[in-house]
Amino acid sequence: MCLRLGGLSVGDFRKVLMKTGLVLVVLGHVSFITAALFHGTVLRYVGTPQDAVALQYCVVNILSVTSAIVVITSGIAAIVLSRYLPSTPLRWTVFSSSVACALLSLTCALGLLASIAMTFATQGKALLAACTFGSSELLALAPDCPFDPTRIYSSSLCLWGIALVLCVAENVFAVRCAQLTHQLLELRPWWGKSSHHMMRENPELVEGRDLLSCTSSEPLTL
């Protein structure tokens, strides 16, 4: 008998779970770098608690960093789970972290959309608060401006756009990872019937496989 998970063999299921975890790790690192760049190029000049808009920028950036860390952790856990599928605590860890990733990424995406909308609505005044002239129409370097006002507006929107795309991608792959671990846990409210299907194989072809592979004597329950 051969164990199948969601229409996939155990080997294919492991590969899909591992690739999903790798994608989450990569996305998390890129998202973390993007948030760090935004902090270094923008927030260190405009992050003043007195300005509500600037404070909102800081909160969204902190949320982006937190989301990136959780995404990386969830991706690593998914990779480990692809090697140790029978571990029930690890299954629950990956499932809960994936759900947390999806929620954080969605919240982060909404926050980034709000930041972009507020920047357009205020014409970037919060970004130029550190400059004495305080107007986005004066696109020239000023002695009392600690940065180049001709670039901070476009740089902020560019970094926010990249971060928004990353958050959406993180949400998609986090949901996919949660779906895969959901199949392992056999939680019925979403899929109804069990996702485990049995298929007969030639006993000679299954010799030498590990405990999670097909066996000729009895089906294996994860």
Swiss-Prot record:
Disulfide bonds: none annotated. GO terms for cellular component: membrane. It is found in: Membrane. It is a multi-pass membrane protein. The chain crosses the membrane at residues 22-42, 62-82, 100-120, 155-175. InterPro entries: Beta-casein-like. Pfam families: BCLP. The keyword Transmembrane helix applies. Ubiquitously expressed in cancer cell lines. PANTHER family: KERATINOCYTE-ASSOCIATED PROTEIN 3, TRANSMEMBRANE PROTEIN 54. This is Transmembrane protein 54. The gene is TMEM54.
